[in-house]
Amino acid sequence: MFSEIQEKIHSGEGITFQEAAYLSKAENLDILQILSMAAQVTANFANKKIDLCSIVNAKSGSCSEDCKFCAQSVYYATGCQTYPLLNSVAILEAAKRVEEKGIHRFALVTSGKNLSNRDFDEVIKIYQVLREKTSLQLCASLGLLDTSRALQLKKAGVSTYHHNLECAESFFKRICTTHTYQQRVATIKSAQSAGLKICSGGIISLGETMLQRLELAYELKALGVDSVPINVLNPILGTPLAGQQIMSSQDIIKTICLFRLILPTISLRFGGGIKESLGELRVLGFPAGINAVIIGNFLTTTGYQIDRELSVIRSMGLNIS
C-alpha cells in the first residue's frame, strides 16, 4: 500500500482514513518512509516558509469549565496565577515586543467558557487600539462565540479565530463534561460565517488512541479550518491528567506526519508541550509537516525564548513569512 499512497501524494491528494490507519501502524524504518512522504508534501505546500504567531494570556484562571488537562480550571488546585482582563496598555506593550522580533501575528487568549459582555466590549476596544498602533495580523481566542460577537471581532480588525476541538468527538467526554463538543463546532462555524479564518487543533497524548488522533484530523478537515495547532499534553500537578504518560517522540513525529498527509494544504502549527515532549528533537517536526509555530510563552507554561527559536528556525534554512 505504500506505493499506492506515494502515487496519491504525488497528485496532491490527501490520504483516506483507511490509508492513514494503515500508516499509523508503521514502526522503525517504515516511519522513515512516512517522514519522507510528509516532507515531500510539506515542501510542496510551504516552500520553506514558516508562519509565526505569539499569544498573550489576557485573562487568567478562574475558568468555570472542567477540562482535565487545564491548570486554569476552578475544579483543580494547581496554583495557577489568576487575574482579570489586562488593560490595553499592557497588551499593546506585549504586542509591540512581538512585532519588534519580526513576528507578524498576535493573539489575545482569555480564560473561561466565554467572556462577559463587559469584558467582550473591552476586548473590542483593545483590538481597535492594536489595529491602529501595530501592523500585526490579529487573532482571538475567547472561548465559545456566536455570530454576533464574531462579526464584531471581524469589524475590530481580527482576522483569525482560534478555538481548539481539543480531541476527537469520541474522546471528548473523557476530558470535559461542562460543555459539549458540538458547542465547540458551533463556535467554529459562527466564526467562519463572519468571515474569520479558523485556527483549530487539539492536544495529543491525553490518553486517546492513535485512531482517535486520526479522527480529530478528519473532523478538522471536514470543518475546513485554515490552521491546525498540534499541542502535546504537558501534565500539570493538580489536574486529573497530572500522571498521564506522554507519547514517545517517535509517535509524536508520526502523528505530525499523518496530519500532514491528511491535511496537505493546511498550516500545521507547533503549539504547547513541544519543549517538554520533544526537546531538541522538535527540529524533526518541520520536515514531518510543521510550517507554523506559536513562539514564546503559552498560557500557564513557558516556551522557548523567542530569539533562540528564531535562530533554530533560520539555521534550518526556513524563511519567516
From Swiss-Prot:
Domain Radical SAM core: 45-275
Keyword Electron transport attached: no
E.C. number(s) listed in UniProt: 2.8.1.6
UniProt keywords, alphabetically: 2Fe-2S, 4Fe-4S, Biotin biosynthesis, Iron, Iron-sulfur, Metal-binding, S-adenosyl-L-methionine, Transferase
Cofactor(s) needed for function: [4Fe-4S] cluster; [2Fe-2S] cluster
Example GO biological process: biotin biosynthetic process
Pathway terms, separated by semicolons: Cofactor biosynthesis; biotin biosynthesis; biotin from 7,8-diaminononanoate: step 2/2
MF GO annotations: 2 iron, 2 sulfur cluster binding; 4 iron, 4 sulfur cluster binding; biotin synthase activity; iron ion binding
Family annotation (Gene3D superfamilies): Aldolase class I
InterPro entries: Aldolase_TIM, BATS_dom, Biotin_synth/BioAB, Biotin_synthase, Elp3/MiaA/NifB-like_rSAM, rSAM
KW Iron-sulfur (keyword) present: yes
Residues annotated for [4Fe-4S] cluster binding in this entry: C63, C67, C70
Signal peptide segment: none
Enzyme class (EC, first level): transferase
Reactions that this protein is recorded to catalyse: (4R,5S)-dethiobiotin + (sulfur carrier)-SH + 2 reduced [2Fe-2S]-[ferredoxin] + 2 S-adenosyl-L-methionine = (sulfur carrier)-H + biotin + 2 5'-deoxyadenosine + 2 L-methionine + 2 oxidized [2Fe-2S]-[ferredoxin]
Binding site for [2Fe-2S] cluster: C139, C199, R269
Cofactor note: Binds 1 [4Fe-4S] cluster. The cluster is coordinated with 3 cysteines and an exchangeable S-adenosyl-L-methionine.
Function, in words: Catalyzes the conversion of dethiobiotin (DTB) to biotin by the insertion of a sulfur atom into dethiobiotin via a radical-based mechanism.
Similarity remark: Belongs to the radical SAM superfamily. Biotin synthase family.
Subunit organization: Homodimer.
UniProt xrefs under NCBIfam families: bioB
Protein name: Biotin synthase
Species annotation: Desulforamulus reducens (strain ATCC BAA-1160 / DSM 100696 / MI-1) (Desulfotomaculum reducens)
Lineage: Bacteria, Bacillati, Bacillota, Clostridia, Eubacteriales
Gene encoding the protein: bioB
